[in-house]
């Protein structure tokens, strides 16, 4: 199924790899994160149009990542990919609003440093 979201994703991937010159591994990470996100939207929510995505959809996706056992760092990285994608969609006039702008990344667990004892 080649829809508005996947077309926009292809444009986004071209943009970050060619125009922004991001490293190949970074581009692959963005693409993997966003394909998973867009697939979830299509299969769970029936959303294939980027302008139909709402803040609640993104928040539900992040909650799903939590249920899947993703670490806080993984969720934060995936959400950063989603933020970049939605900013790009707004810049391309593919959406009327960046619904991801107010979705916050989960807090990472704070680890106390090991204490050196003698």
Question: Language model features by range: what are they?
Answer:
Residues 112-118:
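Long, amphipathic, Lys/Arg-enriched alpha-helical "connector/arm" segment
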